[in-house]
Every structure is written in C-alpha cells, then in structure tokens.
C-alpha cells in the first residue's frame, strides 16, 4: 500500500502506486500530512487533494495509503472542544478520544424522515414574525459582505442554544480566524461551550479542508442526535464557502467548469450535506446556515442551489443597514414554509401578511414621496406610509452579542408578544407614538403603550 509522489501542483499531488490502487476518498499519508484520493488516473496513478500545507514535499517522497476514508472521533469527550475540519485539536488540549466514524455517512431513507411541523422560537422579532424557524429543519441567512450574517448567527446561538440547553455543533467554514476566536470567547463566557462542539476549516486552510469541514460537523451532529436524542442545533458559517472550496477542488482536478465557474457537481455536493440534516424518530437536527451572496446577487448558482434545500430563508438587505435597521432582515424577500395557519395559527399568518402589505405599498409609494412629498398622497396612503415606517422601526432590535459595541442591552421577545406588537401597529393603536420610540426596542410596551 505504498507509492510515491510523481507530481505536485499546489494543494494537488499526483501519486503512483504499483501493487495497490486507492479508492475514491481514501486517505493517504505523505510525510506528515494527509491527502485525499479524488481521481483515479489509471495504471496505478491517482490525483489527490492535500488536507494540509504541501510546502517542502518533493517528487519521489513516499506515500502510504491508509485504507480508510476521512474519519472523525466522536464521543462525550468532544463536548466543549474546538477542532479543525479533520478532527485535530485547536484548543491546545490533547487529541480527542472516542469512536472513529467516517464523515461520509449516507442520508437517512425517505421513510425514516419525519415531517417538520413545529416552530423554534428565536426571540428575534423579524425572524419569528416573517420567517419562523422549523424545529428539525434547515434555515438559510442570505446576505452579501458586511450585512450582519455572522452577528445574527452569534445571536441565534446565544438565544436558542442558551434557552434550548441541548447540544449544538458550530461549523466555521472558510471564514475569518478572528471571527472564530470572538465566537469561542463569547460562547465560553456565556456558558454555552459546555453544550457545544466547534469545528473550524478557516479561510487560510487548503480547499480540501474547507470542503470536508461541513461533513465532519454533520457527522458529530448525527452522533449527538443518536446518542442523546432530542434536538441538536447545527450552525454553519458559511455554507457558501463549502461550495467555493468545491469549486477550487474541481478546478484543481481539471474538471470542466459549469455556469459562473462553479463545479459541474455543485447540486449533488450541496445535497450530500443538506440531505443529512433531518428529523428522525430518535431526534432532530435543526440547521442554521449563513450563506454569502456574491455581489448581492441572489441568483448566483451557489446561493440559488442552497436555497432549494431550505425550509426558511432570511434575506439580509444592504439598504436596511444603510439606514441603521439591525438586524437588516428584508421582510419582503424573506420567507418560511412554517408561515402556515395549521402551524403558527391564523392570527400570526394574518398579521405577517398585513405587515408585508403595508411595507410593499410603502415601497411602491417611495418614488412619489421623493418627487412630490407626503402632502400629495391620499389620506389612506399617508396612513399606510406612517404605519409602514413604524413597522420598519419596530423590526429593529438590540442584540445581546452586540452590547459591547452598541451600548444597548440585548432583548429577547417571546413570539406571542411579537405578534401582538405588530398587530397593534397595523391596527393604528400606535398612530400617536413617534417613529423614534419604536427604534431599537424589544417588547412593544417599551414604546410606552400597553397592548
């Protein structure tokens, strides 16, 4: 099971074996790094992708096939640990112990998957009202650079993981090391690390590591689900970087690119991860995924492919960040399959629908207001605009994880109070209250109104 290096192309190594042919995805050791077999070239030649730095490797170096795919050790010892995408410790502690599991598990059978029928309360008004999260489903947070995806993920971890007190897994895929450090500190200080496993494949890692990190995180989440049952939370920041790493690997392997330079297997690669996130009889995995949108183009092939797998989609708007509305959730583009009378109740659906109607009409009137002013509007339209602006202000909310920067204490708003607050605005009960009184507050009672 030994061969040698016959070619080096950055993170791609070509190997030659004489009496053995490695299988697809088999791990091979070259010096002190692992490489993964990704293409069989014939006559004992294979093309591999490195899972570590290739500096210093020479042609002729020995390669040893390990006879197994990428595995990660799972067990109770993982709780509270910070690991790399290949399972190595990043928290200056010893190597984790436990049962080795392949990261390439098969998704559950169709008949084993349970339907998603209950809502997960987040305490964030814009999300709970307009894009309620499903328990045991998949949620995507879409947005370009700098619109607040990571902050929103951190707030969700704070609100949901602390309140939920079950086990959670965080996968940092292709993001900044600084953000990973900040998140680790935040989770440690809040006590969430006692119920959390963190797995990082950061942006400085080779594409092979970034591409394999979501598989490792999904494997740990599946283990926790089977071992402890209940609900497991799986956070991914950023799932787009997984698709991007796959594009890099595909290009390095010499495959013909498809639209926008993406790998031809983009759809199936995304499905391999997404289809493993499900509700089963033994427990459920609820996944929250940040999705970077290149150049704010939601029709880009990667976000568009990910979108098709989601139960709830939250779109973050740059226009809202420019006017200081945080979280910058676009109420007209965000949606959820949970917004159904049989799931959340008729009152919730009606209030959410009317909120969207007010905001949509306000968008249509903006050009007229800019040209002619509010005075030229009919009394009915003027009323719509005033209430829509108050709705927009009330959609803002101070976050716990941003307290150090904003100076405002974070607020958690129960779902029932969220619906009551927006209903009061659209019914005109706050017509006498100035817009500013609704900006960056939690419960509607903070505006001085009892509803």
Swiss-Prot record:
Please name the GO terms that the record assigns under molecular function: ATP binding; ATP hydrolysis activity; proton-transporting ATP synthase activity, rotational mechanism
Q: Report the catalytic activity.
A: ATP + H2O + 4 H(+)(in) = ADP + phosphate + 5 H(+)(out)
Task: State its location(s).
Answer: Cell membrane
Q: Which Gene3D superfamilies match?
A: 2.40.10.170, Bovine Mitochondrial F1-atpase, Atp Synthase Beta Chain, Chain D, domain 3 (1.10.1140.10), P-loop containing nucleotide triphosphate hydrolases (3.40.50.300)
Known function: Produces ATP from ADP in the presence of a proton gradient across the membrane. The catalytic sites are hosted primarily by the beta subunits.
Describe, as the record does, how this protein assembles with itself and its partners. F-type ATPases have 2 components, CF(1) - the catalytic core - and CF(0) - the membrane proton channel. CF(1) has five subunits: alpha(3), beta(3), gamma(1), delta(1), epsilon(1). CF(0) has three main subunits: a(1), b(2) and c(9-12). The alpha and beta chains form an alternating ring which encloses part of the gamma chain. CF(1) is attached to CF(0) by a central stalk formed by the gamma and epsilon chains, while a peripheral stalk is formed by the delta and b chains.
Q: What is this protein called?
A: ATP synthase subunit beta
């Amino acid at each position: 099971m030994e061969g040698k290096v016959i070619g080096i192309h950055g993170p791609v190594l070509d190997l030659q074996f004489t009496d053995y042919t490695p299988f697809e995805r088999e791990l091979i050791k070259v010096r002190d790094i692992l490489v993964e077999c990704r293409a069989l070239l014939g006559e004992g030649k294979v093309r591999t992708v490195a899972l570590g730095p290739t500096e210093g490797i020479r042609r002729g170096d020995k390669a040893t096939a390990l006879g197994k795919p990428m595995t990660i050790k799972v067990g109770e010892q993982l709780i509270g640990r910070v690991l790399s995408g290949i399972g190595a410790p990043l928290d200056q502690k010893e190597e984790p112990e436990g049962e080795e599991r392949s990261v390439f598990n098969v998704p559950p059978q169709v008949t084993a998957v349970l339907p998603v029928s209950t809502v997960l309360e987040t305490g964030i008004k814009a999300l709970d009202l307009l894009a309620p999260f499903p328990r045991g489903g998949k949620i995507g947070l879409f947005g370009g650079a700098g619109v607040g995806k990571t902050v929103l993920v951190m707030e969700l971890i704070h609100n949901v993981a602390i309140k939920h007190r079950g086990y959670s897994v965080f996968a940092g895929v292709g993001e900044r090391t600084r953000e990973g450090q900040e998140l680790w500190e935040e989770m440690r200080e809040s006590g969430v690390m006692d119920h959390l496993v963190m797995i990082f494949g950061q942006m400085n890692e080779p594409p092979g590591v970034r591409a394999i990190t979501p598989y490792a995180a999904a494997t740990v989440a599946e283990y926790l689900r089977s071992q402890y049952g209940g609900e497991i939370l799986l956070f991914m920041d950023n799932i787009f970087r997984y698709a991007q790493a796959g594009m890099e690997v595909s290009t390095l392997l010499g495959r013909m690119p498809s639209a926008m330079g993406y790998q031809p297997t983009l759809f199936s690669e995304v499905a391999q991860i997404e289809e493993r996130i499900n509700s089963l009889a033994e427990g459920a995995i609820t996944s929250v995924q940040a999705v970077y949108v290149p150049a704010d183009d939601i029709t880009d092939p990667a976000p568009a492919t990910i979108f098709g797998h989601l139960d709830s989609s939250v779109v973050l708007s740059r226009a809202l960040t420019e006017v200081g509305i945080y979280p910058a959730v676009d109420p007209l583009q965000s949606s959820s399959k949970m917004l159904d009378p049989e799931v959340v109740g008729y009152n919730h659906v009606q209030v959410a629908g009317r909120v969207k109607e007010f905001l949509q009409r306000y968008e249509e009137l903006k050009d007229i207001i800019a040209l002619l002013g509010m005075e030229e509007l009919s009394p009915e339209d003027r009323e719509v605009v005033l209430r829509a602006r108050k709705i927009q202000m009330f959609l803002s909310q101070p976050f716990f994880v941003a307290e150090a920067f904003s100076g405002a204490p974070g607020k958690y708003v129960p779902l029932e109070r969220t619906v009551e607050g927006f209903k009061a605005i659209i019914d005109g009960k706050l017509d006498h209250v100035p817009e500013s009184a609704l900006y960056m507050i939690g419960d509607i009672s903070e505006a001085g109104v009892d509803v």
